[in-house]
From Swiss-Prot:
UniProt source species: Desulforamulus reducens (strain ATCC BAA-1160 / DSM 100696 / MI-1)
Family: Belongs to the formate--tetrahydrofolate ligase family.
The protein's name: Formate--tetrahydrofolate ligase
InterPro entries reported in the protein's UniProt record: Formate_THF_ligase (IPR000559), Formate_THF_ligase_CS (IPR020628), P-loop_NTPase (IPR027417)
Annotated keywords: ATP-binding, Ligase, Nucleotide-binding, One-carbon metabolism
UniProt pathway annotation: One-carbon metabolism; tetrahydrofolate interconversion
Amino acid sequence: MKKVPSDLEIAQAHEMIPIAEIAKNIGLGEDDIDLYGKYKAKISLDVLRKFNDRAMGKLIDITAITPTPLGEGKTVTTIGLCQGLGKIGKKVITTLRQPSMGPVFGIKGGAAGGGYSQVVPMEDINIHFTGDIHAVEAANNLLAAMIDTSILLGNPLNIDPMTVMWNRVLDTNDRALRDIVVGLGGKENGYPRQTSFDMAVASEVMAILALAENLHDLRQRLGRIIVAYTYDGKPVTAEDLKAAGAMTVIMKEALKPNLVQTLEGQACIMHAGPFANIAHGNNSVLADKIALNLADYVVTESGFGSDLGMEKFMDIKCRQSGLRPSCVVITCTIRALKMHGGLGNVVAGKPLPEELTRENLPALEKGCANLAHHIKVASYYGVPVVVSINRFTPDTDAEVDLVRKKALEAGALGAYPITVWAEGGEGAIELAEAVVAACEKTADFQLLYPDNLSIKEKIEVLATKVYNADGVVFEPLAERKIKQFEDLGLGHLPICMAKTHLSISHDPAMKGLPKNYIFPIRDIRASVGAGFLYPLAGAMRTMPGLGSKPAAHNVDIDEYGRTVGLF
């Protein structure tokens, strides 16, 4: 049997185009980019002013059904559709989040696609890239250090140490740092207090990077970060600590979007990487706006399912930026739909249960309730919906036909199998043609809720319409926080729900289409710099841990100095 090359082997065998040539192909000159070697570049923010008189392209958002822990190939679909649009002669750019090294060396892997649907240079993208995440880490941790210093040296801002909620961050999965004590060893080491580390991509600084419109906006947003409260209950901000200016300087280069390429030579603007289950889970506004000025079609991706990344794309990113999508593509796999129909227990790092590789039309039909709900959620926003079936070898024609039928019944314009992992853009031509047709339809874009609803009302809209709950229960802590935030004048902010990605509900064990349940809110927090409130539903970890067999075990260099084992 012929050996199937790994993602890394495919990427290493590929002859990349110099990034200056990729830039030229989309209309950028030497003065518009800063080279980071031969195959990576940063794009000057002056490009927005330079091309602001151009007609904007069509924005296509790729989302998904509720995934298994393995993921359903949303990034592969995003890149593959971009390549497919290129195959049919369209001027297209894809915009993606950049990966965090935590998942790269954990179980999930990187975020550069896979097979023949990848962006390159894959190794650089997955490890360090242009240093943006390190800048986020440095800016975040500078603020943390200034908080502890202020408390120790006279506490001029009257900060109550018990209210400090600004954690340090690290771009590594390290569970030992989830619950720690700092400031031990005497007064010269600081004021002892309990705290924790988060993943760098969980930092509000990362969310701010993704939502900032320009350098001035970045500076203002960083200044609005609430880090603690005084003994009198007043918020303390990064501006109060005189930290925001220095943080902005650290983040100045990171604000410039990164330019790389697909395996088939289309431009990819990869920038920012906030988590989708605890933040808003989308690439930067700047990346999308630059791409829309340079291409006729821009294919972007929202994290996890429509209940998380896509909802936040619409209700946070589009609300704040004025972006308007022309089409939504929902990615699904037959294996995941059968799992939602009651078959198998998919566990990250373990082989796929055998029953998910055999034809089972009754289980598939039952699981299609999950797909139908995601189509319904996307339809709330008045945008045409297309379904992409990421096809695997065991999938039968009968199964594909059933999914297509159910997608049409649920209101999608159509459902199209793709084979982009194996065939690149050639495997997405039918989908690409369908998406072009969908983009020609008139979208009647609308947000799910207006700004002037109360905090509770916004949460109730999300719970009943998106999470399919019968209602919401607010725990006492959440009730107190809601009153506090409304008293502070923050009630107008949109909601960024922190919940599991493995279920439409708050409970990862509730597969398919959960119903007849009450959605619980145990706490609510404010990311004022990013511009949203984030309620917590269920247990959420902001610092993952490594498993017994992390991906890091497989990564090494060979005798020629080449990376091996990176997927």
